[in-house]
Amino acid sequence: MKRIVIFVLLSLIFLLPGPLGASPWQELSSPYFTMRYQEPERKMALFLLQRAEEVRGSIIQDAGRAPPAPTLIYLAPTWEQFQEVQPQGQPPTWAVGTAYPEHNLIILKSPRAVKKGRSEVEEVLRHEYAHLVLARALKGHEAPQWLDEGFAMLQSRGWSISWTYVLSRGVLSKALIPLTELSDGFPLDQYQAQLAYAQSFSFVSYIKNEYGAEALARLIKGIAYGLDAEEALRQATGLGLGNLERGWKAELKKRYSWFPIATSFFSLWFLASLLFLLGYWLKRRKAKRTLREWEQEEALQEPPFPPGSFDDEDRE
């Protein structure tokens, strides 16, 4: 009996999660996803797992194929753990999520690590899952980076005024990156990378809006069948990359070139100062006019000679 008790105790010890203070990965599962997280992140993990199931269908719809189930998702609570679970290489320091189609794997930074809320992390999840979906739809063929990232941003629905500012600044300063340079990779510089992401989203959206959702689907299918991006674009839209890029840039100039002027801090400060000075000038002008009117009214009411102009002798 004593040996049985000792055996049970030893078994329980081996089942314990390690030294005090260690945080082993916990796991949650749903029909299409497995979420690994650390205990303080349980509520966030449950939320993201539910949202992943809900948005899966809409993302697959645009690409046509889904990754095999289950897709593994890591929710890393710190930058160090975010790095540790990467299967290859190290992500840029500004990265908040990574996707590895060959591993059917997504790695996310927890909101605790990036000081963001649920909605932002959900956007990152959608973005990274879109990478897996597109890779599956392409059947092992490589998409140009602008298509890969543009499709993912389109699915994440994370476009905001800050992205609009990045893109419009690129338009105004004539610093847009040629799309041919965004085919094989993105710049490592953070601002240039942001511009590359913004351009990719904008260009893929332009294709979808100008030529229809079916054109985007034809582009993806063309690459999946082995066509290069140039030929796939021609079959999807009737135009090659150069002509499409010119039409897209013309649209950008009409849409975004005014934005930095209207929204920059300096412009807003200058406009506020100008309005303040204009208000001050109008107020002074009104005050001077009022003062003149008072002086005119007083002049009409004054006697012809001021009191005390004559003494008593003069009156006699």
Language model segments and positions:
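Beta/coil-rich, acidic/histidine-enriched accessory regions frequently appended to metallopeptidases
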Residues: 27, 191-194, 225-316
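Juxtacatalytic substrate-recognition/specificity segment
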Residues: 22-144, 196, 229
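Short linear motifs in intrinsically disordered
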Residues: 18-20, 221
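Positively charged n-region of N-terminal signal peptides that target proteins for export
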Residues: 1-4, 315-316
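Acidic/His/Gly-enriched intrinsically disordered linker/tail segments
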Residues: 93, 97-108, 116-124, 136-265
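Bacterial N-terminal signal peptides
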Residues: 8-17
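A short alpha-helix capping/helix-coil boundary motif
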Residues: 3, 34-36, 128-129, 182-185, ...
